[in-house]
Amino acid sequence: MNRLFFSKIALWLLDFLTFNISFLLSLFVISYYHNGYEKYLPIYEIDDRTYIHAVLAGICVGWFAIRLRHYTYRKPFWFELKEIFRTLIIFAIFELAIVAFPKLYFSRYLWALTWGITFLLFPLARVLVKKFLIKSGWFLRDTIMIGSGDNAFDVYNALRDEPYLGFQVTHFISVSNISNNVKELNIPILNSMSSWTSVTKKTDQFIIALEDDEEVDRNNWLRYFSTNGYRSVSVIPTLRGLPLYNTDMSFMFSHEIMLLQMNNNLAKLSSRILKRTMDIVVGSLAIIIFSPVLLYLYFAVKKDGGNAIYGHPRIGRNGKTFNCLKFRTMAVNSKEVLDELLRTDPEARAEWEKDFKLKNDPRITKIGAFIRKTSLDELPQLFNVLKGEMSLVGPRPIVIDELERYEENVDYYLMARPGMTGLWQVSGRNNIDYNTRVYFDSWYVKNWSLWNDIAILFKTMNVVLNRDGAY
């Protein structure tokens, strides 16, 4: 417990120091490039400005601690990052008002540089320190999973995908049936009161992740934890399929009823305009930045005599067909090569019928293998984005034959423009099965937000650089 307490103190001190270091670092940068900072901050005001910034740092850290509970509750990385940026924006505007109204000397350059460094340094420092604390074992929390079914397995995977939470699942406690997925994890599974009380502590994190038909067991566990002094208990009900990101929650007084107000953000005109604006602005900038790469690949692919770019029919928003642009990565006679392979190789035919992809595809050219591995074959889709046929982020563009495989989720797919990248691309790409791809596409549409798009774009950069799941 002491280690966890000191981890909280370390995070608190780090945030306070980072906040102040950003101001001092901005003064250093200005001094280095402008032979002193007096032009941007008079010497007689430096003490006042340092004091103001230090007070703001204390208030900001207090806000993180008391209102947002960043040092007591553990939150998923992207959710916490959104709260950090939102808070820093508020405090940046607040400092602007404090400095401007008392008629202190105000430099927009110093203000912008200070907060620009803060926005960069603050989350980076959080990640690095959490990474260090987890690696040293100080921030790790032994976690006991109540349940051993599909819900418990889903929760385990979610925790594994959020390493900075520091939850380390050490045991499962079985209530009824044990799923094969849980068995394959090789994590101890306990099934009696005496067995789990002897290996756990009241300070451990307990997560109740039972199935819908185990409501009685769930209530019994909650009653036991509440009456026996267990404080770190979380309940994760089975809510698969609900649009949780856009849900407002309220409670009925004196009733054990929770009201979830569902909101479909992509159905709002304002949300669609916002998403389209980001597509146009970011897409245009990307074309300008990557224009040398586009030109080089165009001529490199064209060397074998075929077209460098081809358009393949895909299903877009509202079922409208469009030509999805890509650099050609296959031989000119790729159709004949595929037909012959499927006719003579039963294993390849089975793989193709399952996922419409081949891991060892003989149609791919040498330059094609490179640009596929680096995902550069999809760069021409930036023009699809500008035309309004695609979005930077969205469901994976599919052919018409794949629509039937979406079954009841097909309406979600048709609600949004297909994306150059999406949850599928940042979650394993070709290494995941088709049903999981469908799940990711429907989850994205149901839970859309501009912040999710930004998070997926940053995740895509990491995937492309590491070449995860591409072939």
UniProtKB/Swiss-Prot annotation:
InterPro entries: Bact_transf, EPS_sugar_tfrase, Undecaprenyl-P_galact_Ptfrase. It is a multi-pass membrane protein. Pfam families: Bac_transf. Its EC number is 2.-.-.-. GO terms for biological process: polysaccharide biosynthetic process. GO terms for molecular function: phosphotransferase activity, for other substituted phosphate groups. May function as a sugar transferase. This is Uncharacterized sugar transferase HI_0872. It comes from Haemophilus influenzae (strain ATCC 51907 / DSM 11121 / KW20 / Rd).
